[in-house]
Amino acid sequence: MKLEGKTAVITGAGRGIGRAIALSLAKEGANIVVAARSVGEIEAVAEEVRALGRQAIAVPVDVRSKAQVQAMADAAFEKFGSVEILVNNSGVGVHNAIPKITEDDWDLTIDVNLKGTFLCTQAFFEHMCNNRQGHIVNVISRSAKVGLAKLGAYAASKFGALGFTQTTDQEGIAFGVKATAVLPGAVDTKGRADNHDDPDHSALLQPEDVADYVTFILTRPDRVYIAESSIGAQFLKPAPTNSIALKDGI
């Protein structure tokens, strides 16, 4: 197991991608801090981690609150002593055309997706630098690269999170601390279902696909540097733009 003896803090870990990441990292030997607002969900995930033979604590947190984020960090340090991995996975998406974006929806999206990433990173970054090891993975979105219609607040938050990830990585280089941005495409989650009417959910990425990807990144040798990486759903690939007809599928 490549993460034996390490501790990972995962936000948004009560369900979906965060839960899948928690279980995947536990299978590689990591102890897990399961963090999210939903107490019942994170307690259930913590039990799943323990069933895999790893230690886990469930910590309720609203990543918009500096005090709650610091309390999460304090709980992690008290239980495990050190934290080597942080996965910033909390996120929200309220999709509307620009004239219909409310100030409350804008603030919620920016506060969770961008401010939350900042606060959680800040809570662990100095600790990692002092220990001369650490890896921060920010699960962002492919919307960090393309601002599509009705994704104004969402894209703005994700573009910002990508830039912040790059800064985190640059500041961590001298201390052996890495930061990686993971940009998933369409994933079959509750958040996706709330905003999209997908006729075929089997065509979407599954949370486990993203979790496997994050685990791959976190288990590379120290010499490997992955600053940013995308993973997409096959059905969203753009159609070929050339006009050459292919015969017999070749």
Enumerate the predicted regions with their spans:
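Substrate-binding pocket helix/loop in short-chain dehydrogenase/reductase
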Residues: A97-I98, D105-I110
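Active-site helix of classical SDR
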Residues: T121, S157
